[in-house]
Design a protein with these regions (language model features):
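Small-residue-rich hydrophobic transmembrane alpha-helices
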Residues: 1-13, 17-18, 50-69, 176-240, ...
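Short alpha-helical transmembrane segments in multi-pass integral membrane proteins
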Residues: 1-46, 90-146, 202-269, 311-368
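Residue-level hotspots within pore-lining transmembrane alpha-helices
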Residues: 10, 14, 44, 48-49, ...
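Alpha-helical transmembrane segments of multipass membrane proteins
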Residues: 13, 21, 55-59, 78-86, ...
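Hydrophobic/aromatic end-of-helix segments at the C-terminal termini of transmembrane alpha-helices
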Residues: 19-22, 83, 157-170, 198, ...
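Transmembrane helical elements of multi-pass membrane transporters/channels
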Residues: 42, 53, 76, 105-109, ...
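Short runs within selected transmembrane alpha-helices of multi-pass transporters and secretion channels
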Residues: 42-61, 69-77, 98-113, 192-195, ...
Length: 368
């Protein structure tokens, strides 16, 4: 908890203060710069609530409750969409309304999930002597969490570079990619939930020395992710405009809608690799090899950077549409052999541990 408080305060102050300079550095078009500063600045202001929810969700999953965090995640998504419609349509709050909708939904999700955690798990109620900061625990948590955080940061760097390339294409391209990305984020929430469930499942079964269950779990998760990816891609093909209408006026923004549909098409074709990427990455994290998961983020960053530098200048908007698919495929090419290697390493470790225990067991001679 103390680590979350410290990191959230530092990150909130830093990011809010640097919002405009970062957007200027990314060559954000002048006609949308002020609006972008308002929106992203308010989003950064909600960082403490994001930390709160993720801390609570991680604790719940570690205690064997993987369903409740999913319910709160769904609540956040539905509430966010509802508040978007309320603030933007009747209240006419525009960009500020969209940002506040996100902040409020994340705040409610974080606070309510924390209250639920405290009520359901009495073992977590803190006593007087337990509020002190444990340096040993902080070092251990940072050793696990920093590589995972770096993985997300590295992936985000690739996305920022890609966004810089899109910004050069103009405000229409930016609006199209933004609307399409929000639509994709809405549809890929279940995939992320499958991944987080696999992280917990893999870690628990590793603790029980049941790598056979880990393999079966990964195979089942891949099947579920593949079926969902295909189904969501098909649904998106027929209902893309309807879903995008949640984020923009599809009756007047004809050019943006057309570009957004094209972006969604090329990305949805590659939802299956995205699902596999998420399952393998979270499983590897759950098995304790977070550095490998971070290296997959490096592969994504390299792919997005290459697309931004090479394909976007050559192909324009179509090049930007290929950024996510290229990143997903690059990560999969790395993660699949990494997953196989991880399982073999753990098999060898568990076998060595069993042999060691057998050798240490005292030999009992039968009584005469």
């Amino acid at each position: 908890a103390w680590l979350c408080i410290a990191f959230s305060v530092v990150l909130t102050i830093t990011t809010v203060a640097l919002t405009r300079p970062m957007l200027v550095l990314m060559q954000t078009p002048e006609d949308i710069l002020d609006g972008a500063v308002i929106y992203i600045g308010w989003i950064f202001a909600s960082i403490p609530f994001i930390f709160l929810y993720n801390m609570v969700a991680g604790i719940m999953r570690a205690l064997g409750d993987s369903k409740t965090p999913l319910y709160f995640l769904i609540l956040t998504s539905v509430l966010n969409i509802g508040l978007d419609l309320l603030f933007i349509v009747p209240f006419k709050m525009g960009i500020l309304g969209a940002a506040l909708a996100t902040d409020i939904s994340q705040a409610i999700s974080g606070v309510v999930s924390f209250a639920f955690l405290c009520r359901k798990f009495e073992v977590l109620h803190m006593q007087k002597g337990e509020w002190a900061v444990s340096k040993r625990a902080c070092v251990r948590l940072m050793g696990i969490g920093v590589p995972m955080g770096l993985q997300c940061s590295i992936t985000a760097i690739g996305s920022v570079i890609m966004q810089w390339a899109v910004n050069v294409l103009g405000s229409t391209a930016v609006a199209a990619v933004t609307a399409a990305s929000k639509t994709m984020n809405l549809l890929t929430v279940p995939l992320e939930s499958i991944g987080t469930a696999m992280a917990t499942y893999a870690g628990q079964n590793l603790g029980a020395a049941r790598m056979d269950r880990v393999r079966r779990g990964v195979a089942g998760a891949l099947l579920i992710a593949t079926v969902y990816s295909i189904a969501s891609a098909v649904i998106l093909h027929f209902a893309d405009v309807a879903v995008m209408s949640l984020f923009l006026d599809t009756t007047t923004e004809v050019e943006i809608v057309a570009m957004g549909r094209e972006y969604l098409f090329w990305n949805s074709v590659f939802f299956v690799p995205l699902g596999a990427l998420i399952v393998w990455r979270y499983s590897i994290q759950g098995l304790g090899f977070s550095t490998l998961a971070m290296m997959a983020g490096v592969a994504e960053m390299i792919a997005r950077t290459a697309v931004a530098i090479v394909l976007v200048p050559m192909l324009g908007y179509f090049g930007a549409e290929l950024a996510n698919p290229a990143a997903w495929i690059a990560a999969c090419v790395f993660l699949y052999p990494a997953y196989i290697w991880t399982c073999r390493q753990l098999d060898n470790r568990l076998l060595a541990a069993r042999l060691h225990m057998q050798n240490q067991a005292p030999d009992h001679e039968p009584a005469l």
